[in-house]
Amino acid sequence: MTLVKYTKPAVILHWLIGVAILYNLISMLILDDNARSRPFIELHKSIGITVLGLVLMRVLWRAANTPPSLPDSYKPWERTLSHIVHGLLYLMIFAMPLSGWIMNSASLNKNTGLPYSIDLYHIVPWFNLPLFNGMDIAARKGWHEFLGGVHSLSGWALLALVVLHVGGALKHQFLNKEKELQRMWF
């Protein structure tokens, strides 16, 4: 049987997004909001905005290029679960950076009274969304806390989906002896 692989652009986008998400999920678990963590928080934001751009590219690529079919050996419930997990992964990979960006736009730096800036990798200034301009400090703080909760819960949901995705790939590779990992490699 011939191995049907993903296209090289799909593979590159998959692994770039995967590594970026892995960093941001790990940083979510170990960072706190203090001065020592600020450089890592800034990197977290830069990676999040990068993921947003990469996932948009991935969705456009996928719309124009049909991915390979799942192997015939997949059971119906595995096919259904695979489609559900992939759909939710795309949703969360898009929602996570977007919710972080909106949350940052609602933030106020204690020293300046302005929203925290986002400078992608300390090189490219990125803009905050004007959704909260003119809003009083208490309302902004309330939105920032609410959006922080949404971003945090979404992070846990994304982590669970990543575990399902990786677990499914490893199950098919090692238990079912299918060349699952080779399909998403160069």
Model-derived segments and their meaning:
Residues 1-186:
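Membrane-embedded alpha-helical bundles that constitute the cytochrome b-like, heme-associated redox core
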